[in-house]
A protein has these predicted regions:
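Nucleotide-activated chemistry modules centered on ATP-dependent adenylation/adenylyltransferase
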Residues: 1-41, 49-268
Length: 268
């Protein structure tokens, strides 16, 4: 369904010109039968509020938590991103949450950031040569356009494990004056357009749930189960949260409003 994907991305980030659209020509068509699976879902997990909320709503051994660290904005020059420190931090995060949710887990590393995409050049060409000027493009640009494609480096694993349903925690923002405004690379229209080999995204978790309510749900779920988890929300690409950026501050306030101390949830 490449034409559908292209049309949807054009609607959000474009309009794109028809001649920009690539194509895939199959020389041979063969039947692909997905193997039987003991799993129901892949739940994408970054450690943030949206991802943890998706995890607590889909716990247990029938679900596989999948983390793709390169979806996050990472500066190539920093050791915690190009070396083992950053990867080890992500492994620890998903391993600890898998113990909380009692799900299996998988961490996928790729070379998209380091070797495949020259992000600065692509962003510049899209703006100056292709003249993209949509509201969504100015909001998150090439980072948003590549987001789901990068996330779908998990696709071969999903197929090999026989998993047909992909679950993504929604980052949709509820804005009363413009309720359907969602200028993010994880826009539900974009994820809904992606279908391949019997695999597709399910309805995004928490699509119409406010962030403050998600944090409250996480706290209540953990307290009911007698468990605790870290929540990773920092804008910084360091292995430690700064606790002073916008995302850190608002998450800590959400935790306080839920009656908890942020220190016990990965802050400070």
């Amino acid at each position: 369904n490449l034409p559908i994907i292209y049309a949807t991305y054009s609607k959000i980030y474009g309009p794109f010109k028809e001649e920009w659209c690539g194509k895939v020509t199959a020389k041979t068509v063969v039947e692909n039968k997905m193997p039987k699976s003991r799993f129901d879902n892949i739940v994408f997990f970054s450690g943030g509020v949206d991802a943890v909320h998706a995890g607590i709503n889909n716990p247990g051994k029938r679900n596989v938590l999948v983390s793709v660290p390169s979806i996050e904005y990472m500066e190539k020059t920093k050791e915690e991103n190009s070396g083992r420190d950053f990867i080890n931090a992500k492994i620890q995060l998903i391993r600890e949450f898998s113990a909380v949710s009692e799900s299996d887990w998988l961490l996928i590393t790729n070379n998209f950031v380091v070797d495949v995409f020259d992000d600065e050049r692509i962003q510049r060409d899209l703006k100056d040569s292709f003249l993209l000027n949509s509201e969504a493009f100015f909001f998150d640009g090439w980072f948003g356009i590549k987001y789901l494609g990068n996330l779908l480096s998990a696709a071969p694993f999903a197929y090999a494990m026989g998993i047909s349903n992909l679950i993504l925690g929604s980052s949709f923002e509820q804005l009363e004056d413009n309720f359907y405004s969602n200028l993010d690379g994880s826009n539900p229209e974009l994820s809904d357009s992606i279908k391949f080999a019997g695999i597709s995204f399910g309805k995004q978790d928490g699509l119409y749930t406010r962030r403050s309510q998600k944090v409250k749900n996480i706290v209540e779920w953990c307290n009911t189960c007698g468990k605790r988890t870290k929540i990773r929300t920092c804008f910084s690409d360091s292995t430690e949260q700064c606790c002073v950026c916008t995302k850190c501050v608002r998450t800590q306030l959400n935790i306080i409003c839920a009656g908890e101390n942020p220190i016990h949830w990965g802050f400070g």
